[in-house]
Amino acid sequence: MQPPRERLVVTGRAGWMGMGRGAGRSALGLWPTLAFLLCSFPAAISPCKILKCNSEFWSATSSGSHAPASDDVPEFCAALRTYALCTRRTARTCRGDLAYHSAVHGIEDLMSQHNCSKDGPTSQPRVRTLPPAGDSQERSDSPEICHYEKSFHKHSAAPNYTHCGLFGDPHLRTFTDHFQTCKVQGAWPLIDNNYLNVQVTNTPVLPGSAATATSKLTIIFKNFQECVDQKVYQAEMDELPSAFADGSKNGGDKHGANSLKITEKVSGQHVEIQAKYIGTTIVVRQVGRYLTFAVRMPEEVVNAVEDRDSQGLYLCLRGCPLNQQIDFQAFRANAESPRRPAAASPSPVVPETFPYETAVAKCKEKLPVEDLYYQACVFDLLTTGDVNFTLAAYYALEDGKMLHSNKDKLHLFERTRELPGAVAAAAAAATTFPLAPQILLGTIPLLVLLPVLW
């Protein structure tokens, strides 16, 4: 049987803060939920300090000289009591915070499972080792396990890398190179695996507008062995930080902390995060008022999920739900047709958009290849009227050039491009039959609609 210490460390890799196989199913089920809630209610924008309590508890139970050794149930209970005390101290500022209330219930559950009394000693604060003289951000003596490629090459062939990106109104390129235009208003998980959680929030471009764009992004790097502490990065409209939520720029105080680094490429516009311990690179940009996201990640990490059935909303892996996808081709066909005169009755507020020809010309300037990035650019100018969306599509393609491992798959094209020709052939065949004129007139609209209904 695995000793408690090892079980704690193993679970640290796979989840948020679960207690390993020794904990009951109810406790293990709590922590993924808590991770999702923490994405939605981050400490960076709230006086509630539950994230600090979570981090301190995990630090106390995952590594270092104060971590519970084998059969150290009393010490583990002491860590739980310290965790409970921390939550009580922040209770006044956490009223109504779902992450806080989930943590409180989780503590009660774990104390019950481990037969911990509510009264008793608490754990001592973790003794942090001082960094060597100089800048603590520049340590380079990371253990091999904290460098994914070195560790991987030792045991097998080079890893296969995949790419996912989100930009514009919003458009999603999945890890499997599917390209979708989605509604997805509100908060949605882009990535949810054993090492990383990424959540985006999309809001209407203007009140009353159907067009949405990414206004908020939260990335949670989970605690990983001797490499990194749990770290949270959050960006919002008009605020692209150059550091994690706790002010640091690397993975914390562990020996391999330098395997997670954040670098500001262009102040307030472009940030890059390198997570070498999982072979991952993330690019976050602010273009105009809105955010774009791009990631390069090994397939092994992409698919590292505990419960595959619970990953239905992992957008980068699964794509957008069907009821959230927009038929981009039908919209374009509508836009290409002559505009009807404005209706006399009042209509909802919509942004002032570009004529189709102008949108095409502006997108051509930045995106000469008429691929799906170009089509996305045209779509965004037609729906938002914001010329910054041209740059969003351009930078999404540039990030793809840097992050995608297969340059032959960089440009994606419409898979149904042959359909209009097929419809024309069907229409020609239909005219060879001696049908009554009124039946033919009824058939033609249906044939025209086939590309939309396909």
Swiss-Prot record:
Expressed in gradient in periventricular layers of the developing nervous system. In adult, expressed in scattered cells throughout the brain. The keyword Cell membrane applies. It is found in: Cell membrane. The record marks 169-170 as: Cleavage. Residues 1-47 form the signal peptide. Disulfide bonds join 146-227, 164-316. It comes from the Eukaryota. One of its GO terms (biological process) is positive regulation of membrane protein ectodomain proteolysis. This is Repulsive guidance molecule A. The lineage of its organism: Eukaryota, Metazoa, Chordata, Craniata, Vertebrata. The gene is Rgma.
